[in-house]
Amino acid sequence: MATGRGRILQQHWLGLQTLRGPSRGGGAARGRARAFGCRKGPGVKLSAGSAALRCHAGGGQHWESSFSCCSGFLDGMPSEILLKIFSYLDAVSLLCTGCVSRRFYHLANDNFIWIGIYSTAFSPARSNWKFNSVEKIAMSMSFLSVQDKEAGYWKKEYITKQIASVKAALADILKPVNPYTGLPVKTKEALRIFGLGWAIILKEKGGKEYIMEHVDLSINDTSVTVIWYGKKWPCLASLSTLDLCGMTPVFTDWYKTPTKHRLRWHSLIAKYNLSHLTISTMIGCDRLIRIFCLHPGLLVGVWKKEEELAFVMANLHFHHLVERSTLGSATIPYELPPHSPFLDDSPEYGLHGYQLHVDLHSGGVFYLCGTFRNLFTKRGNIENGHVKLIVIHLKNNREHLPLIGKVGLSWKTDIFDGCIKSCSMMDVTLLDEHGKPFWCFSSPVCLRSPATPSDSSSFLGQTYNVDYVDAEGRVHVELVWIRETEEYLIVNLVLYLSIAKINHWFGTEY
């Protein structure tokens, strides 16, 4: 049988050489499967190490004729021979081959091929997975019943286990926690090792979608800033929503491959309504663009003249970032596991032992990086359903803090760049008395003149406020511009924590 197949393959190969004429080079093919592909150059190349079944343009009519010749040759091959070729491909190449045509898709689902890949990757001898005796017996029985499984069963099993192995590795690397921030120590390392990226999906009102991978990112102390820009944005007037998704390679080492067409799964982080780009959400502008803040943490830049998208910027806090970027699906965000309340042994004393870390930054420049420990408030300090936690007291000059440098939010596109005054990114990490993250967020903010005079107006200088609000709390910052030193001075910083959040967290009834 093997000899007969070899002669058939040899005849097909000789026939192909006759049709295409003398070879123009290309060298010997790597691996046994190369013997059945087209030569290096114009046409189609099948190889064990190739990331996809792809066409290499040679230019003009010659490429078209070469491609149609090779394509016709492959389509005319018996399924038995194609299956033999596919059996030499690795998992990545086999998955990409299945995208070429409907026939290739069905052939690339062959259970005998995939069970070989599965058993090689996850055999007890080689895998990091620990199999008990029952699992080993179940696996052996599954191997014996390959023919009884529907087509593609073992492909799905392989991909499912690959994803599970990535998730298990992520959970393991995120276990160590920094006692000062309450966040995983190796978040930055996890982002690098697993090739985690982000994409936005712009959806038109008619249903058409545009997927854009991030162009640039910067990793901060407790957050990551992700940026999208380019020349080919869809018309803003036709867009309805924007989905922010995390992207993770199914195969952990494949993200190093330079090709753009990689196999990844998407995890929905947040969905935004682009009809909310109104005057109420605009936080700043310069001579070229206007910027809008959409909750949570999204900044959208729009050209003033054309009223079209200029860039999108997302600021993502490290708290549960890896889980939210990997463990959700393309349509459903990751849900945090149910919270078990930390029993408060002294509710009559209110909140105590809290710690706050706050950053104000933009473009890698930090205007404020402060940590405040041993924060407390009395139980009776409640206003409008919120517990008031004072971090910087207005009347205590020793607590007042200056901002470093001139505050501004840096932006760039592939053509222009700029800086919008009085805007920046704010990262807040609040830890409870047990050192657990109680409230975390990252969001664009801006300095605004207060609508009504406040107590800080007694200071020499113009006063400004920075305010942030979400379902879990509110941040209020008062600043004074000191003209002599040309710097902002924080004279008041107050957190307002939702009573509903506190009761849920501690099982109390404030």
Curated annotation (Swiss-Prot):
Role played: Substrate-recognition component of the SCF (SKP1-CUL1-F-box protein)-type E3 ubiquitin ligase complex.
PANTHER family given in the database record: F-BOX ONLY PROTEIN 15
Disulfide cross-links: none
Organism: Homo sapiens
Domain annotation F-box: ranges: 77-117
Keywords: Ubl conjugation pathway
Source taxonomy: Eukaryota, Metazoa, Chordata, Craniata, Vertebrata
Gene3D superfamilies: 1.20.1280.50
The organism's place on the tree of life at top rank: Eukaryota
Pfam families associated with the record: F-box-like
Assembly mode: Directly interacts with SKP1 and CUL1.
GO CC, alphabetical: cytosol; SCF ubiquitin ligase complex
PROSITE patterns: FBOX
Protein name: F-box only protein 15
